[in-house]
């Protein structure tokens, strides 16, 4: 049986698409290989959100070109955001790649089976793409140019997929989109994310629902209320701010101010005092001075996030920022600001997790990791526990006995649902 190998970088949507493509290859008669050298087909699922990620993709492709020179029968497939909407440009740049198709698309060199392409034994926590694309065109972001405009799937279609995943063993779904808060705006009935959450909530056997990524300007009170009142919806929200300075936010074309963002957070915390918030932050955006960075730092400290995904700005081709704004913050200064935020996160999250010592939590166990069961709380905290019992897929009650900024150690109290 011929082998296939997947190399994936980037967001959870990329991982979800790679999982689906892997299942498709298996339907075509391939089996998963341990490494590229053992495969007849290698798929590269690419990301170009940051320059560092794009460089990794290009380096990987050149390594595969060398492998193909040694094994001319090897077929290389490329998808993801490196491809974008103009495949001809990629074909010219990487002529040794055999198959190229855009992000979110399916390969066209063989027949595609009808219906959902799902794993026979899906993970406990399964990714489900509910929409593609983005209409916001933030000045630094290449995603709208690569994945196109927003396109939502219907509630009925998503519901059928989730129900089938649950039937096959999943207990949680993570709803994915570049901007899930805009879900449904392009559909005839104009449903919203809150409507989708309500529909999925009724699926028997589904224990939890998560979603990402959100845009602060698009979060409605209806969504906040749905999260607060639907028990299966996790108390976890990704709320990317990108900057804490109003001038920089305007240059980014984010559509809100520091104060408006703070007011949104206050509304969310009022409705859900136990909410776990995560954010994305860019340091060193064009023209960002020390005072503007300090506004970001202060916002991070004031909100007290459970996770801060921070990155140094890098210009992306096609974007307004790359075309019209000078990348004028020195690299050494970007690195300094990056470290300050990382240190703040370690301190803030460390204190928040330490406050959980000797408390109880409900954990959905996802599987084994280094001989320990691994799962997450309703707020998304990573928890490890030891037990000889088969706990995969179980909802368990645990007691926290050790904490760190990155995870919690717990003891099993009892199994709540198996």
Curated annotation (Swiss-Prot):
Top-level taxonomic group: Bacteria
Keywords: 4Fe-4S, Cytoplasm, Iron, Iron-sulfur, Metal-binding, S-adenosyl-L-methionine, Transferase, tRNA processing
Domain Radical SAM core: 120-351
InterPro entries assigned to the protein according to its UniProt record, in alphabetical order: Elp3/MiaA/NifB-like_rSAM, Methylthiotransferase, Methylthiotransferase_CS, Methylthiotransferase_N, Methylthiotransferase_N_sf, MiaB_methiolase, rSAM, rSAM_horseshoe
Cofactor binding, per record: Binds 2 [4Fe-4S] clusters. One cluster is coordinated with 3 cysteines and an exchangeable S-adenosyl-L-methionine.
Cofactor list: [4Fe-4S] cluster
Cross-referenced CDD domains: Radical_SAM
Binding site for [4Fe-4S] cluster 1: 11, 47, 81
GO cellular component, one term: cytosol
Record flagged with keyword Zinc-finger: no
Enzyme Commission code: 2.8.4.3
Domain annotation TRAM: ranges: 346-414
Domain (MTTase N-terminal): residue spans on this chain: 2-118
GO molecular function: 4 iron, 4 sulfur cluster binding; metal ion binding; N6-isopentenyladenosine methylthiotransferase activity
Catalytic activity: N(6)-dimethylallyladenosine(37) in tRNA + (sulfur carrier)-SH + AH2 + 2 S-adenosyl-L-methionine = 2-methylsulfanyl-N(6)-dimethylallyladenosine(37) in tRNA + (sulfur carrier)-H + 5'-deoxyadenosine + L-methionine + A + S-adenosyl-L-homocysteine + 2 H(+)
Subunit and partners: Monomer.
Family the entry assigns: Belongs to the methylthiotransferase family. MiaB subfamily.
Protein name: tRNA-2-methylthio-N(6)-dimethylallyladenosine synthase
């Amino acid at each position: 049986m011929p082998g296939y190998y997947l190399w994936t970088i980037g967001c959870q949507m990329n991982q979800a698409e790679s999982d689906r493509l892997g299942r498709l290859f298996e339907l075509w008669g391939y089996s998963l290989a341990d490494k590229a050298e053992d495969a007849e087909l290698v798929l590269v699922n690419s990301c170009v959100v940051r320059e560092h990620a794009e460089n990794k993709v290009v380096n990987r492709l050149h390594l595969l070109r060398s492998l193909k020179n040694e094994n001319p029968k090897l077929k290389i497939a490329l998808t993801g955001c490196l491809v974008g909407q103009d495949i001809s440009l990629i074909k010219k740049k990487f002529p040794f790649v055999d198959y190229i198709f855009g992000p979110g698309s399916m390969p066209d060199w063989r027949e595609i089976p009808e219906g959902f392409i799902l794993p026979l034994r899906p993970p406990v926590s399964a990714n489900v793409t509910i929409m593609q694309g983005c209409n916001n065109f933030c000045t630094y972001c290449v995603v709208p140019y690569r994945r196109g405009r927003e396109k939502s799937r219907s509630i009925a279609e998503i519901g059928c997929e989730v129900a089938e995943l649950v039937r096959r063993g999943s207990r949680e779904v993570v709803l994915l989109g570049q901007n899930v808060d805009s879900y449904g705006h392009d559909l005839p009935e104009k449903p919203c994310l809150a409507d989708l959450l309500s529909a999925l909530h009724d699926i028997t056997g589904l224990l939890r629902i998560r979603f990402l990524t959100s845009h602060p300007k698009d979060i409605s009170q209806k969504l906040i209320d749905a999260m607060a009142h639907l028990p299966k919806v996790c108390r976890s929200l990704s709320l990317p701010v990108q900057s804490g300075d109003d001038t920089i936010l305007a240059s980014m074309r984010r559509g809100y101010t520091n104060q408006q963002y703070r007011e949104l957070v206050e509304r969310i915390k009022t409705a859900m005092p136990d909410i776990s918030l995560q954010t994305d932050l860019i340091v060193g955006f064009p023209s960002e001075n020390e005072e503007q960075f300090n506004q970001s730092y202060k916002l991070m400290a004031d909100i007290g996030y459970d996770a801060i995904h921070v990155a140094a700005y890098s210009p992306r081709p096609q974007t307004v920022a790359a075309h019209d704004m000078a990348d004028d913050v020195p690299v050494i200064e970007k690195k300094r600001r990056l470290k300050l935020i990382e240190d703040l996160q370690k301190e803030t999250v460390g204190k928040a997790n330490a406050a959980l010592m000797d408390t109880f939590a409900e954990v959905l166990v996802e599987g084994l990791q280094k001989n320990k069961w691994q799962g997450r709380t309703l707020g998304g905290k990573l928890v490890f526990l030891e037990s000889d019992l088969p706990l995969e897929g179980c909802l368990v009650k645990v007691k926290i006995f050790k904490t760190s900024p990155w995870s919690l150690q717990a003891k099993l109290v009892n199994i709540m649902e198996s």
